[in-house]
């Protein structure tokens, strides 16, 4: 949790409005940097870019849309990385790809979806297309295999996204939950390990 990280992390980069939550949890204002979409900030050798997403915000009843939701771009001299965050599919992915792509690695939301939630969570096929839109060299599906918020099966997100990604010639990294990966390694984990789970 943030409360366990606050003594170990020197800077917190958040979308606009999220700093209030961090201050309430004891993070010093001096350590919080809130960004609007398309704003960039440097930290040592890294550049963080707050980019659009399509979701909502809120941590309790009555505060929905009180803060900005976002995706993130993390750039170094060696890597250009995209993190989709929670997002419905939309034209913002192509815009991000045009402005900041191609990306060496993209972590793309895939899971906890329903046709009724299309504005805030992508279907797996849209996840694969969004990776193409941002010009990812490799995508890693995230937001699946953990908490259950939707009615789909546990394997449905990963089976559908890998199938669509294959159709689109989009390489997919599929590390086991908790397995570390090396971003500049020529081969990413691609084993279909979930097929072994009953």
Q: Language-model segments: what does each one mean?
A:
Residues 7, 11-23, 80, 88-177:
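Cap/insert and terminal regions of metallo-dependent hydrolase folds
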Residues 28-30, 47, 154-156, 188-190:
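Short low-complexity, flexible loop/linker segments enriched in glycine and/or proline
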Residues 1-41, 51-57:
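Active-site HxH/HxHxD metal-binding segment of metal-dependent hydrolases
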Residues 7, 27-30, 46, 67, ...:
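Structured loop/turn residues at beta-strand edges in well-structured enzyme cores
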């Amino acid at each position: 949790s943030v409360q366990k990280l606050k003594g170990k992390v020197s800077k917190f980069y958040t979308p606009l409005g999220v700093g209030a939550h961090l201050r309430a949890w004891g993070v010093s204002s001096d350590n919080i940097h809130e960004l609007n979409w398309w704003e960039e900030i440097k930290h040592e050798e890294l550049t963080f870019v707050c980019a659009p997403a399509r979701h909502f915000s809120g941590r309790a009843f009555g505060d929905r849309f009180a803060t900005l939701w976002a995706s993130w771009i993390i750039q170094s001299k060696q890597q250009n990385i995209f993190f989709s965050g929670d997002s419905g599919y939309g034209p913002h992915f192509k815009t991000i790809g045009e402005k900041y792509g191609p990306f060496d690695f993209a972590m793309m939301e895939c899971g906890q979806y329903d046709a009724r939630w299309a504005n805030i969570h992508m279907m797996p096929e849209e996840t694969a297309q969004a990776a193409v839109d941002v010009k990812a060299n490799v995508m890693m599906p995230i937001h699946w295999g953990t908490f259950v918020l939707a009615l789909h099966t546990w394997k449905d997100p990963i089976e559908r996204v890998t199938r669509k990604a294959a159709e689109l010639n989009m390489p997919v990294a599929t590390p086991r939950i908790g397995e570390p990966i090396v971003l500049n390694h020529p081969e990413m984990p691609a084993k279909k390990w979930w097929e072994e789970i009953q």
